[in-house]
Amino acid sequence: MNTQVVLITGALTGIGRAAAVAFAKKGAKVVVSGRRDEAGKALAAELRSFGSEAEFINADVRKEDDVRVLVDKTVARFGRLDVAVNNAATEGAVGPITEQTAESFAATFDTNVLGVVLSMKHEVRAMQAQGSGNIVNISSTYGHEGAAFASIYVGAKHAVEGITQSVALELAKSGIRVNAVAPGPTDTGMLTRFTGTAENKAALAAQVPLGRLGFPEEVADGIVFIASNEARFITGHVLNVDGGHSAN
């Protein structure tokens, strides 16, 4: 990863933050993005402490102008874009389908699906100009499973996987690989909000064949691998990092 330029959306917490640290420790130049200036600048400073060149750029992936500026600033600062990790997401509304609204649907899909589409649009343009690149979209094991009372989130992650595989085929001969990483139950703030109680969280962990929740750093290892040259013959793939959850 040394000298490669990596852009990560939703980078300020959880899996995004762990991925930023993992890439920085491997010598990549890292641009982290999110919507909280203080946290973003602090993360960039932390990444620089590992010897990485790092920048924070505030952007809302739901807004195309923000995404365009994010990619343009990345290329202007570092000259290219080698790896894009589209991680920005929200857990959305949890509850029965009878309680969902147009607003709860839009709130989830605008970030989890539209945000990925807009990000890929501008990332691909930058990568096409240089003739190479890697895109890693962050899905979930719920991107190929069902989950009661999480229909909107599950639907959004199914969409991410379908978009990933379709764009991978679209770009297969262009030098750009497109893959997804699907975390299983991972100990993040989003999971804590999603499960609601410590008891629910423990029950979810008990369903994992390896007997525990994953750590963000373990998902980050999968992201770094799928973006690396070791995975050069892999495109259109969804890599489960889930402790065996999807095989259960």
Residue spans of the language-model regions?
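Conserved glycine-rich cofactor-binding loop
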Residues: 12-13, 36
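Short, flexible catalytic-loop segment of classical short-chain dehydrogenase/reductase
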Residues: 37, 161, 178, 182-193
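Conserved mid-core segment of classical short-chain dehydrogenase/reductases
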Residues: 68, 91-106, 125, 129, ...
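Short C-terminal tail/terminal secondary-structure segment
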Residues: 91-94, 145, 224, 235-248
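Catalytic Tyr-X3-Lys loop
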Residues: 98-117, 132, 136, 160
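Active-site helix of classical SDR
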Residues: 120, 156, 164
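Alpha-helical segment proximal to the catalytic Tyr-Lys
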Residues: 125, 169-173, 232
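Residue(s) in the substrate-gating loop at a strand-loop-helix junction
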Residues: 140
